[in-house]
Amino acid sequence: MMQLSNDSHCNKHSLLNVMNRFIAAANNMDETIMVPNLLRDVPLEDQESHASVSHNNNNNNEPSFPNKQRDMYEHYLLLKSIKNDMEWGLLKREMAGGASFLEMAVKQEELPQMKGEAVEEGPDLEGQFHYHLHGLFSVLSKLTVQADHLTNRYKREIGGGSLLR
């Protein structure tokens, strides 16, 4: 049986630590935002200007993708949904009848075979693992920043009363 060292819990660059930071930020967001409906119709413009600055400072030259959410409420729901998927896994989504990420991945794997294209005989599993691990670190770090930003903006806007109608 493989034993984990205690250092893995302390390593700030571990996947578990990055996941825990996002979940903590999402929990803080959820505890702070007592009335999520106040976020309806509040534009993401403040966050988009913040995101464009962070994308310009990005050392990885990663492409920036526009947000699909129309307002802060939809962004809040997205972050909360991702947190729930991480905590409860994909089984809950599958039981609800929605297409799971696993099903989508299997369908993507089957596409080249259906088109008659040759699928690589010996996939580089280690390379794929590191590629996706890097992606997880990147996405979870960005989601953590977004959850913190949404929480702080909610506090600022509610404190000023600008979201109250």
UniProtKB/Swiss-Prot annotation:
It comes from the Eukaryota. Residues 46-67 are annotated as: Disordered. Keywords: Cytoplasm, Cytoskeleton, Microtubule, Nucleus. It is found in: Nucleus; Cytoplasm; Cytoplasm, Cytoskeleton. Gene3D superfamilies: 6.10.140.1610. GO terms for biological process: regulation of cytoskeleton organization; regulation of lipid biosynthetic process; regulation of ribonucleoprotein complex localization. GO terms for cellular component: cytosol; microtubule; nucleus. InterPro entries: Lipogen_MT_Stabilize_sf, Spot_14. Involved in stabilization of microtubules. May play a role in the regulation of lipogenesis. Belongs to the SPOT14 family. This is Mid1-interacting protein 1-like. The gene is mid1ip1l.
